[in-house]
Amino acid sequence: MNKIVLYLLVYGATLGAAYDLLKAPSYFEEFLHKFNKNYSSESEKLRRFKIFQHNLEEIINKNQNDTSAQYEINKFSDLSKDETISKYTGLSLPLQKQNFCEVVVLDRPPDKGPLEFDWRRLNKVTSVKNQGMCGACWAFATLGSLESQFAIKHDQLINLSEQQLIDCDFVDVGCDGGLLHTAYEAVMNMGGIQAENDYPYEANNGPCRVNAAKFVVRVKKCYRYVTLFEEKLKDLLRIVGPIPVAIDASDIVGYKRGIIRYCENHGLNHAVLLVGYGVENGIPFWILKNTWGADWGEQGYFRVQQNINACGIKNELPSSAEIY
């Protein structure tokens, strides 16, 4: 038998055996203790257990069917899918539209670049952050790309202020959502962005307290890319740096490790940062930085299979910016 096929069969069998639905009550009690969960009443606890049980069944099914990835009980396991998406993502239409970003059509076939590339290995990606219960993924993904742009240009990692974007971007709607290219446009409108230390994250909408004297990054120009080939993202990634992309996060909530091959694509609701790509056991994958904390996924990152539009990664035009 082919070694890769044998590996996947054994790996899949191991994953499928990891959880037993009949043990849901004991798993739930362990979950409550591990994540310090408290509910307002016994009826609420029962409701949360039923949601937990449903999520556990889905985790077991995913571990049996998606043999290149592993899924687990985590801090979101007592939330319905709709609750998780509404509280911990945040990609949405802005209040008004602007068109500052130049549209670039990438119609040439992909170049024959390296099989693997990862900006983290070059120390050009800041640490994983946690957006909490604020729908500001759009701000984190956009500023994550600017942080990497700054590191590439100045060989220095610096954390930028998502809170400034939340409070002072009057096109997007703060913790109630936004888009990637409009966030770039907002930074251009404001004249720049401050460091996180000067304008700390609060995970809430607040009054704008911007101080132009403390801007550390200024955006010269922004771009949106029309790509005919998903694989063209490799060229773009290597040339311009990490790229914010929009996805459907519905199928990544319980992710633990591995390469996601089966991922819903029913509507974009979350923004993440594309930082690299590679191949494992014959499966080409993208490496994406999430904003759910380093205790989620692969130390805050996840991988999806390339060239199948996993999680709708190709549905929205990717964007980037050029800094001064």
UniProtKB/Swiss-Prot annotation:
Keyword Protein biosynthesis among record annotations:
no
Q: Where is the signal peptide?
A: 1-16
Gene Ontology molecular functions? cysteine-type peptidase activity
Cystines in this chain: 134-175, 168-208, 263-311
Task: Write down the superkingdom of origin.
Answer: Viruses
**Protein's job:** Cysteine protease that plays an essential role in host liquefaction to facilitate horizontal transmission of the virus. May participate in the degradation of foreign protein expressed by the baculovirus system.
How would you classify this enzyme at the top EC level?
A: hydrolase
Task: List the glycosylation sites.
Answer: 159
GO:BP terms for this protein?
A: proteolysis
Listed EC numbers: 3.4.22.50
Which family would the database say this protein is a member of? Belongs to the peptidase C1 family.
Q: Which Gene3D superfamilies match?
A: Cysteine proteinases
Record Pfam families: Inhibitor_I29, Peptidase_C1
**What UniProt keywords are attached to this protein's entry?**
Disulfide bond, Glycoprotein, Hydrolase, Protease, Signal, Thiol protease, Zymogen
Q: How is it modified after translation?
A: Synthesized as an inactive proenzyme and activated by proteolytic removal of the inhibitory propeptide.
**In its UniProt entry, what is this protein called?**
Viral cathepsin
Q: Where is the active site?
A: 137, 270, 290
Q: Which residues form the propeptide?
A: 17-113
Q: Which PANTHER family match?
A: CYSTEINE PROTEASE FAMILY C1-RELATED
Reaction it catalyzes: Endopeptidase of broad specificity, hydrolyzing substrates of both cathepsin L and cathepsin B
